[in-house]
Amino acid sequence: MNRIYLDQASTSFPKAPGVAQAMMDYLTMNGVNVNRGCYSSAYSAEEVIYETRQLLAELFHFSKCKNVIFTPNVTTSLNFILKGFLKPGDHILVSAMEHNAVMRPVVQLASLGISFDRIPCRTDGSMILEKVEELIRPETKAIVTLHASNVCGT
């Protein structure tokens, strides 16, 4: 029986070819935590992380791979950015389709003097990009948009 999976936008399933095998190889052949020891397996783990940072820095055109940080999940990442970067008087734009992981901290930040506007979306969930430029102000510090919606599939 063929399986149909309809929640692709909210998870990382199914894994790309080779990902599950690479994870299994790491877990069975190394499996140690990074920066926890001075032995060959620990050094191998650090090398994997460093190489991954380098690849991501290249992908995103960062000048230094140390600017790549890893977090447990996207909610933690969003909170680092929103709560660590913005200050009272700042303004951000969020898409009207944003997930609660974005909207809850954004609404909380509004009570601290950080304003936001929502970028309107069409009925199919796609953003009305022409509105973005109209909503940008001198104090706009970030534009937060989702890549794919697990609500409507766009």
Where are these regions (language model features)?
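Pyridoxal 5′-phosphate
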Residues: 1-154
